[in-house]
């Protein structure tokens, strides 16, 4: 018999194809913006922990890059390897799928999670867009056939629909453990990392479909001076033309990027922010394994 009052703690991997709502789901569960989001695929590049402690239960969510096909650069290999590694050594796996469409990349992820031996939950996202819920039944039945050991829960990550039910199922699957992190800690990532991600998010929201994947952000200075947090961020691109696009006509685009990033940073860090942005050309960085490691992309 399970002790419902036991202290529980464990790791929960959130996996799925790009742009399916994984980071939105994490942010809604945590009740604050931690993972960056955009409408463009492959927004998330690194695994990041989002930690939620509620009473005796501590769930440590692993937000992962979207598993994707195509893209032969070292950066693409890194993201796929990072996402696949998250399936190992976790206590629960959440496979997020979009009810509105099924792609080859969804199928690729499904074929990988079929080998998960621990608890597997399929979070059927964007069900708020379906007026007649009976339309969900064929898809639910098909998913259950493909993943007979999975528990399928319809949700809306954007609207927060049915997330309480999802979290209840997750908590029931977590092992009895002492908590691994202090109850007020929400992530394993540094403030410098979060600041860089916020700048990159604003770039992705400002620019076209291809350019954001050839951009990364490095924080060169992160210093509290009195009541103001001073942050200097370096935006790396691969070509001179990309630098001009980011700066924009008379510097208008980079000014908008900085203004939007600063507002989110002030909310996240609860401090006045002085943000300075620079753009630098570093040719071929996204396919240079040594450069990627120096930029914090780990083992490739």
Swiss-Prot record:
Q: Which residues form the Era-type G domain?
A: 8-176
Q: Which UniProt keywords apply?
A: Cell inner membrane, Cell membrane, Cytoplasm, GTP-binding, Membrane, Nucleotide-binding, Ribosome biogenesis, RNA-binding, rRNA-binding
Q: Where GTP is bound, by residue?
A: 16-23, 63-67, 125-128
* Classification via SUPFAM superfamilies: P-loop containing nucleoside triphosphate hydrolases, Prokaryotic type KH domain (KH-domain type II)
Region G5, as annotated, extends over 155-157
A GO molecular-function annotation: small ribosomal subunit rRNA binding
Q: Name one GO cellular component term.
A: cytosol
Write out the ranges of the annotated region (G2): 42-46
One Pfam annotation reads MMR_HSR1
Q: Where is this region: G4?
A: 125-128
One biological-process term from Gene Ontology? ribosomal small subunit assembly
Q: Which family does it belong to?
A: Belongs to the TRAFAC class TrmE-Era-EngA-EngB-Septin-like GTPase superfamily. Era GTPase family.
Please state what the protein is called.
GTPase Era
């Amino acid at each position: 018999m399970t002790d419902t009052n036991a202290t529980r703690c464990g790791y929960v991997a959130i996996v799925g194809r790009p742009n399916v709502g994984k980071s939105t789901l994490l942010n809604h569960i945590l009740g604050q913006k931690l993972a960056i989001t955009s409408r463009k695929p492959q927004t998330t590049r690194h695994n990041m922990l989002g930690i939620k402690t509620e009473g005796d239960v501590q769930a440590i969510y692993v937000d992962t890059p979207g598993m994707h096909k195509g893209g032969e650069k070292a950066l693409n290999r890194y993201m796929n390897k990072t996402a696949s590694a998250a399936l190992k050594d976790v206590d629960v796996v959440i496979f997020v799928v979009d009810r509105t469409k099924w792609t080859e990349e969804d199928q690729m992820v499904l074929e990988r999670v079929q080998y998960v031996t621990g608890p597997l939950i399929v979070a059927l996202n964007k069900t708020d867009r379906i007026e007649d819920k009976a339309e969900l039944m064929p898809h639910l039945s098909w998913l259950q056939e493909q993943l007979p050991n999975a528990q399928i829960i319809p949700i809306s990550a954007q609207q927060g629909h049915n997330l309480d039910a999802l979290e209840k199922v997750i908590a029931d699957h977590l092992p009895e453990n002492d908590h691994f992190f202090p109850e007020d800690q929400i992530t394993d990532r540094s403030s410098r990392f979060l600041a860089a991600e916020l700048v990159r998010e604003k770039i992705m929201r400002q620019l076209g479909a291809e350019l954001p994947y050839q951009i990364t952000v490095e924080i060169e200075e992160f210093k509290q001076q009195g009541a103001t947090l001073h942050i200097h961020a370096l935006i790396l691109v691969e070509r001179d033309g990309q630098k001009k696009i980011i700066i924009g006509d008379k510097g208008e685009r980079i000014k908008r990027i900085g203004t939007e990033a600063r507002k989110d940073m002030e909310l996240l860090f609860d401090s006045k922010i002085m943000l300075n942005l620079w753009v630098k050309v570093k040719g071929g960085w996204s396919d240079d394994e040594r450069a990627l490691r120096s930029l914090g992309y780990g083992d490739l």
